[in-house]
């Protein structure tokens, strides 16, 4: 803070969502941090992200109204899908992300559209992060139409499609490059980052898989154009705020009680065994359930 360093809290796993927001707001609520501008990342492939953006906007509005500085939210699509799939499969949980790439792309545009207004950018400035030229053009035009050029900047990954980055920098006036830095003696911590970049370049549903053929191959261009238009056609600003995919609630289960088994042993034996899903600590109700159990331990006789 004293040296003018900008701190941005990144978002990795779904389980970090609530914790990262809580840490971010708690630190910036400290009196000596009220004038410090920091940032946080939200991943559009999580249905939870629009609601999280709205909660951050409400918090930031109060912060600015009381004399504090605004903050920054970096909007990304999300690059940890494989990890989220593994996590869900291992623990018996619902997948945290949207069911399709198109749904993620639609939510990305909805988050930008919701946040990119003069009233809201007074509290939160935006980082539009991504490599998709159609999405960058969408955000660029939306930024101009809403008159919020000074509150929205574009961000791309350093080293990926550098020719495109030069064009984006020239046309938008500014480009922030996301650069990973790691101690050479701890290079293993960068492996997951490199794997995600390889996956982005190889997966056919990702824009980067055809980026080098975009100008010369009409089919590739049409494919990406049609994907963009399909996601845009699903955009409904007035639709209800998406709810999380995971709804496990041990607290509600405890209050409702365990239903009595009414079937016979023979009937149960015909059904395949399905293990009870692990309790998900990423969910607020489950965390409260765990706290209640811990609080009851000193006086428990069982």
What are these regions (language model features)?
Residues 293-302:
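Glycine-rich loop-to-alpha-helix module at the N-terminal edge of alpha/beta enzyme cores
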Residues 263-266, 280-282:
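Low-complexity, Gly/Ser/Thr/Pro-rich intrinsically disordered linker/tail segments
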Residues 30, 117-118, 275, 279, ...:
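Polar helix-capping/helix-linker motif
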Residues 1-264:
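Positively charged, amphipathic and often flexible ligand-engagement surfaces
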Residues 14, 287-294:
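Short alpha-helical interface patches
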Residues 264, 271-274:
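Extended boundary segments
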């Amino acid at each position: 803070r004293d040296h003018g360093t900008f701190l941005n809290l990144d978002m990795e796993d779904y389980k970090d969502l609530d914790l990262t927001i809580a840490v971010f707001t708690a630190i910036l609520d400290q009196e000596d941090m009220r004038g410090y501008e920091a940032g946080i990342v939200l991943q559009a492939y999580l249905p939870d992200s629009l609601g999280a953006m709205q909660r951050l906007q409400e918090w930031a509005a109060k912060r600015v109204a009381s004399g504090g500085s605004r903050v920054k939210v970096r909007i990304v699509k999300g690059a940890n899908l494989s990890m989220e799939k593994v996590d869900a499969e291992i623990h018996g949980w619902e997948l945290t992300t949207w069911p399709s790439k198109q749904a993620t792309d639609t939510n990305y545009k909805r988050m930008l559209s919701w946040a990119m207004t003069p009233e809201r950018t007074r509290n939160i400035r935006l980082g539009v992060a991504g490599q998709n030229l159609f999405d960058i053009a969408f955000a660029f035009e939306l930024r101009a139409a809403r008159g919020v050029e000074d509150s929205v900047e574009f961000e791309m990954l350093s080293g990926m499609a550098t020719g495109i980055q030069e064009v984006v920098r020239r046309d938008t006036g500014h480009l922030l490059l996301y650069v990973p830095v790691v101690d050479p003696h701890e290079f293993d911590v960068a492996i997951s980052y490199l794997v995600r970049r390889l996956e982005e370049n190889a997966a056919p549903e990702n824009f980067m898989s055809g980026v080098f053929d975009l100008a010369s191959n009409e089919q590739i261009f049409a494919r990406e154009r049609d994907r963009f238009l399909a996601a845009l056609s699903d955009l409904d600003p007035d639709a209800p705020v998406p709810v999380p995919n995971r709804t496990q609630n041990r607290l509600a289960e405890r209050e409702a009680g365990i239903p009595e088994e009414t079937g016979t042993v023979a009937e149960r034996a015909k059904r395949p065994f399905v293990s009870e899903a692990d309790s998900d600590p990423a969910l607020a109700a489950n965390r409260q359930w765990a706290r209640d159990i811990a609080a009851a331990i000193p006086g428990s006789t069982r």
